[in-house]
């Protein structure tokens, strides 16, 4: 729209993208320049191949077309899962927002990709989200080209998306208003909780009580091997670990990797 071009874009069966555009040469050149230099923050372009085509079809607009299962590449590039973005985090905490406190909040800048994809091309019908048809509210965002959830394949809300629930270790459901807050309370009291994430289960316990940690080590057969520690923020991390700018950059990146750090002098977590 910015460069006044017409045509279409569509996903391909190898996770590539096909773009067909018509317009003035200068506008097409500007588009290709923007494609390389002003791509979305999460986009990674491995290769751009262009070719001139005879204009066999007239286009009235630029649209997103139905995906194709055709492949052009020798392999596939599957997008990774991405940690929650700052905008979704703000919405998550805003009581006036429709997705307030919704654990599965996502947009085009964050959320699951790799672990929800069942096959390519990357469309909702080819992911685990096919079991959750969008409500009218989510569909309007999905169709709005000015919205950051425009064609976000995992878009969902409390009305149409997955629901969180809490069970006893025997599988019986615990009937509570907020399963996530209830699970947090159990953790604080010393319980071990199995959290089902995008790609499997995480066994977690509090880091400040010795008994649950000893029990978790016995359960996992990890007498000495370190566990990964989740922390609320860099400010909290400063209270028990040392890190520099590079570590801080990694910890707050969209990858959110596990980073090995030195204990601080005032380290207080259980061993």
Question: Where are the language model's segments positioned?
Answer:
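A phosphate-binding glycine/aspartate-rich beta-alpha loop in the early core of alpha/beta enzymes
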Residues: 13, 192, 200-267
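Intrinsically disordered, low-complexity, mixed-charge
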Residues: 1-165
